[in-house]
Amino acid sequence: MSVSLQKGQKVNLSKDNAGLAKVIVGLGWDEAKPSGGGGGGFFATLFGGAATTHQAIDCDASAIMLKNGKFVDRTDLVYFGNLKHKSGTVNHMGDNLTGEGEGDDEQIVIDLSRVPAEYDKIVIVVNIYQAIHRKQHFRMIENAFIRLVDARTIKKCANII
């Protein structure tokens, strides 16, 4: 059964997906095309007037493992700077800096069957790297999604749009 969620909603995967052992969390996005054509036109480009400081929008997926509903230790955060949880049950598959390409741009693989018992929740979050410094926000991306897939059957469990 696939569930569609909106921002901030929660889903209990074990409730509706009996036997779910390993999930893939996939994050995808595309940079929105600037309205009005973008870089200032032909002459701006020709004479150096086009924007040259543009930085790609870098969305990042992270998994936070909670004990009794609380974040206790920074090693329980799995992200581009800590690709593997100490238990080996949560693995970030690498950082995509641009969102280019089709399908998942970043993935986190979670082996639910091996998560140590002291962890009661895993929270998935998405942020834009250095968003304030780069003056970027989520309205600057399009076609964004987070999907949870059963790694064994490749069946979608949840989709967040």
Protein language model regions, located:
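Intrinsic-disorder/low-complexity signal
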Residues: M1-I161
